[in-house]
From Swiss-Prot:
GO terms for molecular function: antiporter activity. It holds the Pfam family Na_Ca_ex. It is found in: Membrane. Membrane-localized H(+)-dependent K(+) and Na(+) transporter. Belongs to the Ca(2+):cation antiporter (CaCA) (TC 2.A.19) family. Cation/calcium exchanger (CCX) subfamily. The chain crosses the membrane at residues 10-30, 86-106, 131-151, 167-187, 203-223, 224-244, 331-351, 362-382, 393-413, 416-436, 480-500, 506-526, 531-551. This is Cation/calcium exchanger 2. It comes from Arabidopsis thaliana (Mouse-ear cress). It comes from the Eukaryota. The keyword DNA repair does not apply.
Amino acid sequence: MGFSFSSNRFGYLTVTFLLVISCLLLGFFTNPVDSSALRPKSEHDCSALKHFHDYKSKCAYLKSIDPCASQGFFDYLSFLYCNFEGFPILGQFLLFLWLLLLFYLLGHTASEYFCSSLESLSKLLNLSPTVAGVTLLSLGNGAPDLFASLVSFMGESKGTYDVGLNTVVGGSGFVTCVVVGIISISLHKRRVRIERAAFIRDICFFCAAIGSLALILVYGKINFWGALGFCSLYAVYVAFVVLSWRFGGDQGAESDLESIHKRGSLSEPILQRDGLEEIEDGVVNGEHQIVDDDDDHQRYYYWKRLVIWAITLPLNLPRILTIPVVSEDKWSKPLAVASVTFAPVLLSFLWNWKRKPTSFEAGVVYLIGCLIGIALGFIAGATTKKLTPPKKWLLPWLAGGFVMSMTWSYISAQELVALLTSLGYIFGVSPSILGLTVLAWGNSIGDLITNLTMALHDGNEGAQVAVSGCYAGPIFNTLFALGISLVGCAWEAYPLSIVIKTDPRLLESLGFLVAGLVWSFLVLFSNRMRLGGVMGIGLLVIYLASLSLRIMQTVGDAH
């Protein structure tokens, strides 16, 4: 169903968005930025907060020395300690609520915008399903982990790299142990058989990836060429899959490619469904369903949609009006014009983030962004049709959607890592353990829902696809997502090497990850490649043992 966006609703949305932007800009201009706030804050140690025992003294410490550099747009520590001295529970509740919203933003942006742009680009470039499956669509499926890893390594607070490392390792452990384990237990009565060649290939490549990462951690440093070599292992994996499918008739490779396509269409954030997609349609369509007062169920559904629409409007509106979308079922000319107009304005705001808003340089950047936005909006309005998306010059539209969806994903991941780091200081928990658990679980819960649903409802083929996806995803996250982060960080330090502090506990997590792979290998081969309860229970025990050990170590450090 195409979008028939009403002009009145479009006007309301535009005015609302402009009011929000105006309030933000007004806040910047009416509160001059101290130049000291723009200087790096790494010369002080934020961990000194633990020596203060009340909110008032912590707030005074933050204001006097300002020791905690936040990667995000908000200073969460000052927000809590300086505004909720008398209501600490309320402040902590608001931070956890914001954490859930950030997970929603990251997952929803990746699935609805980023993946959509990648799929459209693969069609426009006439990529074969083989190449598209292991490149663009893998990038879409692994987007949350990719951006979280990039932010951890490339952000201003370089000390958060352990968050990125633990997130990738924790997510890989969760998917290969918990997700595969639950699938195996759920299918133990069906005695589903897994394709041998594909399983061996994925296990071998994953073990090679884990071994390479362990060597990097043990050595403690890596240069640009070493990081590039680590990342290029994923290119070797892609080439192996493609060649196996093209020349060897490898059905396992074909199943893996199909799994990536299915995951690309099924993988969605946990907060997205139950009406959110329909609410977003209601935002752009400007339609309200006429309900019969005598039909309680229909009236309940209407009000449910309305409440969810109102709650999600502040989250969805900025993205709707800054990310170009040109798909057949979501086309709206007013929204398209608005998105290409506001997108440069948003980019100019991000470019000026660390500048003093009233400076001459910031004003020039804002002026350039506004002029480019007006020009693009005029061109879009003059060259597009009201009812159908553009057929010519489609690449610039898709490239714009890709860039802006990537921008929003990076913003969400940046805030997520910044908030988790702050929560670590607030509760005295290492940010790395939060990356290993909270961030890894949040990014991987979609894999659990998607793969389990596929395995239960799509027969033996669905089970094969689900299990293959449980190994293909972590391979991508380890080699490409983590690899490209290392490449970017090493490039900044080139020709010097970047130092990665050796974390024995991270090596322990890698050891448990290998133990899970070995257990799966031994049980499957002894059971003629059939999934079963023994395999699933063993994987869950391994994961719980790994998690329990890390938690006990963290509690011991706290005392």
